[in-house]
Design a protein with these regions (language model features):
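All-alpha prenyltransferase/terpene-synthase fold signal
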Residues: 2-11, 20-362
Length: 362
């Protein structure tokens, strides 16, 4: 089934001819925004179905002794979700003319790494959340001990899966991909970002620079790896990979800004996880810091936003997205699209996913 979906996806995605490039990156963004031929919803559904299929085939128990830990791993891995990271990997691969078969193992690994981070983030020692994607979190069902080990096993399985299943790609590219995946998890990746995030809770002297470092590493690093590995597998040049990484870092920050806004504007039912956790834990977030920012550009709206947050999340209106954090997210997405201006119509999926990141409801 997975191979059939891969073949169908490869045939259904046709690279459009590259039109004459506008004079400036901003003009390119405007031109891309005006185009209506690309169906993002259909693209995302196609890639979601492909991702679900390859994920389901990627993990199974090999003996009775491993049944429990594999059950725990599969519970979180197959619990649904947006599957944005695999989509970004596939989109980057296609942008450079690569095959979905070549990038599929890396797409699986990216989602495994993401799932590992969610299992660990939800633990009582960290974010202490009982719900994820509308379901009880892993540790609630299996206990803290099994959840920790399931996350650990998920991480190691991600690397094993890439090494064993990536076919038709030069070995040096696979090694580069493994190195990128390793870096995005480590001290300068999501683990380092999570540590600084935890240690910043309740502190009043955390500034925007620190917050940007946290989320560039905690959130954006894995998105960066998703786009960059997809490009590497397809044979992109170093310069092209660098542009992809810049794009991904910007959408990663935009993703986190949108997440912070949703935490104070959406309900638990809409989010599929406990709403208001950031405020309750006194986490440093973009709404909190931008609400207190004294810059001329944001002064009036920021003060209003800050006062609302400090009073209670229940009083924050649906208009919160029009305040500074929402504008910042849109600015980041515009800048991200500019990074891909040289790729013309081939960048339509990545540009569409950038828009989706700040328009999503959960």
């Amino acid at each position: 089934m997975a191979l059939q979906l891969l073949a169908a996806a490869s045939l259904s995605y046709e690279v459009a001819s590259i039109a004459r490039q506008p004079r400036s990156p901003r003009a390119a963004v405007r031109a891309a925004a005006a185009a209506t031929s690309f169906d993002l919803a259909a693209y995302m559904e196609e890639k979601r179905l492909l991702t679900e299929s390859v994920l389901d085939a990627s993990l199974s128990s090999t003996c009775p002794e491993t049944d429990l830990i594999v059950e725990s791993m599969r519970y979180s891995l197959m619990a649904g979700g947006k599957r944005v990271r695999p989509m970004l990997c596939y989109a980057a691969t296609e942008m450079f003319g690569g095959s979905l078969e070549a990038s599929s193992p890396t797409a699986v690994a990216l989602e495994m790494i993401h799932t590992m981070s969610l299992i660990h983030d939800d633990l009582p020692a960290m974010d202490n959340d009982d719900f994820r994607r509308g379901k009880p979190t892993n540790h609630v069902l299996y206990g803290d001990d099994v959840a920790i080990l399931a996350g650990d096993a998920m991480l190691s399985t991600a690397f094993e899966y890439v090494a064993k299943n990536t076919k038709g790609v030069p070995a040096e590219r696979v090694v580069t991909v493994l190195a990128m995946l390793g870096q995005c998890v480590g001290p300068v990746g999501l683990a380092g970002g999570q540590v600084l995030d935890l240690k910043s809770e309740g502190k009043s002297d955390v500034g925007l620079d620190t917050l940007a470092w946290i989320h560039t590493h905690k959130t954006a690093a894995l998105l960066k790896a998703a786009v960059a590995t997809g490009a590497v597998l397809a044979g992109a040049t170093d310069a092209e990979v660098a542009k992809c990484e810049e794009y991904a870092l910007k959408i990663g920050l935009a993703f986190q800004v949108a997440d912070d806004i949703l935490d104070v504007t959406a309900s638990t039912e809409e989010l599929g996880k406990t709403a208001g956790k950031d405020l309750d834990a006194d986490k440093t977030t973009y709404p909190k810091l931008m609400g207190l920012d004294k810059s001329k550009e944001y002064a009036a709206a920021a003060a209003q936003f800050a006062r609302a947050i400090l009073r209670t999340r229940a009083q924050i209106s649906d208009g919160a997205r029009s305040h500074p954090p929402g504008r910042y997210a849109k600015q980041l997405v515009t800048e991200a699209k500019e990074c891909l201006a040289d790729f013309g119509d081939r960048a339509a999926p990545l540009n569409g996913l950038a828009d989706y990141i700040i328009q999503r409801k959960n």
